[in-house]
Amino acid sequence: MSVLGELDLLGPRAHGAACGEAVLKAVAEDFQVDEVLDIPLSGEGEHLWLWVEKRGLNTEEAARRLGRAAGVQQKNVSYAGLKDRQALTRQWFSLHLPGKADPDLGAAEGADLRILRRTRHSRKLQRGAHAANGFTLRLTGLRAERALLDARLERIAADGVPNYFGLQRFGHGGGNLVDARSCAEQDLLPANRNLRSRFLSAGRSYLFNRLLAERVAEGSWNRAAVGDLLAFTDSRSFFLAGEEECRDARLAALDLHPTGPLWGEGDPPSGAGVLDRELALAGSEPALCRWLAKAGMAHERRILRLPIQGLAWHYPEPDVLQLEFVLPAGCFATVVVREILDLVPTGQTENPCAY
């Protein structure tokens, strides 16, 4: 089986070649994620909400540990989104405990998991309920000219970056996509819910990235065209662009963006030449598109351009770049870094030069 690389799974950069190279995730603390949840919690109800810090632990395993410690079935443990294993992350979980007192969750805690806050609420935590994620990234072993880095960072702060799904979505070497294609060709859906979700997501994400890669290559990823479906940064609804909509000032302000397809049942509702492009993409991957539709996936949209909120940076040491920013839920910090630096595996940098 051939291994799929970054260009196979994502596409070209929008802002030119990387300014240099660095290491990300030399230790878990180098990649910190804080979930941003805009839900006022009532303090009472049959759902126990937990603000959890985890280190080197994926979300699904954390949920299993919390469920076992609470003595509840896994279906009664909820979380808003999946967070990286190789990171220090803080996110919410909820446990459905009707008529039960708060359980002792000490068995779930350890060096890799701490419960920082507990409160009650009347409803469970829904998937995708978080508004955003805040990131603090520490890039070490930096080899780059600082003036070039600063200019690139200013540019992406002003213009955003292509909103690719990151490599994490596709598994090691693109294995999740390989498995998705295999399922599609056999017209099968995995019985295991987590595997099914993982493979369907990989298939949809790949099709979206293919479309976005085409628009990055031609320079139209950040411009609206007649027939595009436009969406605001934090909205799942969209509307068709005509001539007037293409001149909307909110496009230049990075509040409104063209979108691409998250494939599902039926043809995309885009118009004019945009629809032709999206149907041509479907025609190049017919088995995958049929499989996604048959699985009952609804046709959705995702913004092509990723605005970066509150981007700040500094150099705590000559060979270290620290970044802080906020991204909408479902977007990948690694695609931001990709527009700045090449990432090299831990231990493969030479002694860095300080510029």
Curated annotation (Swiss-Prot):
Catalytic activity, as annotated: uridine(13) in tRNA = pseudouridine(13) in tRNA
Family recorded in the similarity comment: Belongs to the pseudouridine synthase TruD family.
Organism: Pseudomonas aeruginosa (strain UCBPP-PA14)
Class of the enzyme per the UniProt entry, highest EC level: isomerase
Function, as annotated: Responsible for synthesis of pseudouridine from uracil-13 in transfer RNAs.
EC number of this enzyme: 5.4.99.27
Keyword field: Isomerase, tRNA processing
InterPro entries xrefs: PsdUridine_synth_cat_dom_sf (IPR020103), PsdUridine_synth_TruD (IPR001656), PsdUridine_synth_TruD_CS (IPR020119), PsdUridine_synth_TruD_insert (IPR011760), TruD_catalytic (IPR042214), TruD_insert_sf (IPR043165), TruD_pseudoU_synthase (IPR050170)
UniProt domain TRUD: residue ranges: 160-306
Keyword set includes tRNA processing: yes
Gene3D superfamilies, per database record: TruD, catalytic domain, TruD, insertion domain
Cellular component annotations (GO), alphabetically ordered: cytosol
Pfam families on file: TruD
GO biological process, one term: tRNA pseudouridine synthesis
CDD domains assigned to the protein according to its UniProt record, in alphabetical order: PseudoU_synth_EcTruD
Protein name from the UniProt record: tRNA pseudouridine synthase D
